Design a protein with these regions (language model features):
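Oxidative protein folding and maturation machinery
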Residues: 1-78
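Short, small/polar residue-rich loop motifs at catalytic or cofactor-binding pockets
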Residues: 63, 86, 164-166
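Hydrophobic, well-ordered secondary-structure elements that form the walls
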Residues: 90, 133, 176
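Conserved redox-active cysteine motifs that mediate thiol-disulfide chemistry
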Residues: 92-109
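Conserved segment of the thioredoxin-like fold in thiol-based oxidoreductases
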Residues: 112-156, 162-163
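Thiol/disulfide oxidoreductase modules built on the thioredoxin-like
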Residues: 140-142, 149-195
Length: 196
């Protein structure tokens, strides 16, 4: 019989999945779909699980997951509107994530070279305080649109399957299909040279 306690325990397993050798994400997806799906629709834990299940299916060739988030001035931006008709890099990062910031910095030359040829970058910072994002942008000099996800309000990281990470990069084509997940700058450059 499905209970909220059981659903909460299932959520806990999603947070430990990367370290588990006995349990796969497919196992958790199956348990959720077969036992809990639709049983606790108004509960925050169920909302988390729905997003987590969706995120487990993200792969190259899939359509990107749309979201809306504010910029530093509080103006709301919808990702699909910002990247429509362009090859786009969705850069999920955080001021406290050194590797994320190095990856973002490595994309600056590509942005400068291809921004007028149909390529764009939209960065989203995962922060507790907006000031942390603003300081990082000022220090690193990101020239592209930067949005902020405060306190995981929109669950963007969960939707993209990187809830336990500082960030990740997704390259999408003009139609919104994912071309690459966590590509290096060299891989992005090779794709851009072929497509633009």
């Amino acid at each position: 019989n499905p209970t909220l306690v059981g659903l909460s325990q299932l959520k806990e397993l999603t947070m430990r999945i990367r370290r588990s050798k006995e349990l796969s994400s497919k196992d958790i997806v199956d348990v959720y779909n077969n036992i809990y799906a639709g049983k606790f629709a108004d509960d925050a834990t169920d909302n988390y699980m729905q997003n987590w299940v969706i995120s487990q299916n993200i792969k190259v060739g899939d359509r990107f997951i749309d979201f809306t988030a504010p910029d530093a001035k509080g103006e709301m931006h919808t990702l699909s509107k910002e990247i429509k008709g362009k090859i786009a890099l969705i850069d999920l990062w955080a001021s406290w994530c050194g590797p994320c910031r190095r990856e973002s910095m490595s994309m600056k030359p590509l942005y400068e070279s291809y921004k007028d040829k149909g390529f764009t970058i939209v960065g989203v910072a995962r922060e507790r305080r907006q000031e942390d994002m603003e300081a990082a942008i000022k220090k690193d000099g990101y020239p592209w649109l930067c949005l902020v996800e405060l306190n995981d309000a929109g669950r963007i990281w969960d939707k993209y399957g990187v809830g336990n990470a500082g960030g990740a990069i997704f390259l999408v084509d003009e139609e919104g299909k994912i071309l690459a997940i966590k590509p290096s700058a060299e891989e992005v450059k090779a794709i851009l040279e072929k497509m633009l």
